[in-house]
Amino acid sequence: TKHDMFECLCANQSKTLVAIRKYLVNVGECEESFDVCFRLLTIKECVQRIARFLRVNPTEETELAYYTSLQTFSYMLPFKAEKGMEGKLSVMNIAYMNDPNEGRTLQKSLFAGEIPFEGDIRHRKDARYPYVFIKCFTPQIDFLPMWEMYGDYARGCCLVLDWSRIRTQKMEVPLYHVCYLSSDVEDFHVEQQFNANLTSYKEMEEELHELAALCDLLYRKNDAACLEAMHSILNEILYLFKDSSYAYEKEVRICYQYPGVDEAFRHTSGEFCKLYVATDFPVAIKEVILGPKFLNRSE
């Protein structure tokens, strides 16, 4: 019966159902909540399919790098690394991402240009950020636009990872392609020219349009509890989409997500602490490339 389903979902402690369980606890048992719950479960399934589309399984031939400042790189080294961080990457919370459109691109596509998860623009912006942690990589190695944007204005370094050594540890890395969305007056698109790494860009576009239709049905209910649950479910993929103007980056991301405060959370030292987690695997670096404007390069 529906009552049994309600009791079962409320009692289920699976982390994947946290958002739906919280919604049911908030609104209680009624015909409307069962309908919303079914649609939220359908959205969850669609989100999981999209995440699988974007998943990267690196091979020994995979060449990915990330650009950083020399100071940040130094914190990975034994003489400066915090306890337990030797040879590991710091994966920062999305609150510190330098692109103001992070998480917005997919929202605009799904909700006809609106950004519902940031609240009413007439009121103060909600400063709370989800427990989503991102590390960005690219196959664009020693590439000038990447140096200027992410390599401390070409004064930093480009770290090329050795995936053959990482793979020998047989640990699952939550690595995803970024999907680049283009748009016209009427709709959004997943174009092959911007997404050469996707196995089926057409299938991805179809999944996104199905997701948009599902989200629209719930968004029109104008229900705060429903919107919160939908936001929590969509967080799994919100930060895996960017505007097609960034397609030259060919970005790949490690993405860790947590439903709440977790013992894995760390804070940087200093006056203004920043929230991060460590990769659950040690990183093997194949090559360190110094930027074209690296100070004292000849030394």
Outline where the language-model segments fall.
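Partner-binding and oligomerization surfaces adjacent to conserved cores of proteins
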Residues: 2-299
